[in-house]
Amino acid sequence: MNNNQIQFGGRTLEILDANAGLSGVKFLPSQLSFVTAGYDHTQFLAPLTPGDISKCTSYVTGADKKAVEVFSKFEAYNKQMKETKLAFMSFCTLIVTNPLEDVQFPKLIPETAEEVYLVKNYQERLKKRRQELQENKEIVKHLNIE
């Protein structure tokens, strides 16, 4: 906890990365390796405090070529107030590191209304992500590395 008795954002991201990685392990064929390539739509929506019981949920929402998108959210349950709030959400991109052109991913079968919505909009997010990657390449050209 930080000096305001709120969980450090870095700790939240550490849990997120581990949990998203577990989703990748469950989704991908066992012979494939992957690394975390990036996060987007990352938002801290409400603080996680000492009185909260937090739960991190992650699941795959799309896959294309060598990339797998994983959605993660933190819910915080306040046991005194008996209330649950959405504390954090993010999309994580995992990249398969095996030397393959395209990976044959398992079929995604969304089960809940939330999963159906997020899986349905994957191609839209992928298009935006590819645009952002091009923009980042341009930014990198102008950065000083010492």
Please identify what each model-predicted range represents:
Residues A18-A20, P47, S54:
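Domain-wide signal for the mature, well-folded portions of proteins, strongly enriched
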Residues N3-I6, A46-P47, T84:
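Short histidine-centered beta-strand/loop micro-motifs
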Residues T49-I53, T61-E146:
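HotDog/MaoC-like acyl-thioester-processing domains
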Residues M1-I15, L143-E146:
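A conserved, well-ordered hydrophobic junction motif at loop->secondary-structure transitions
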Residues R11-Q31:
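Active-site helix/loop of acyl-thioester processing domains in fatty-acid/polyketide metabolism
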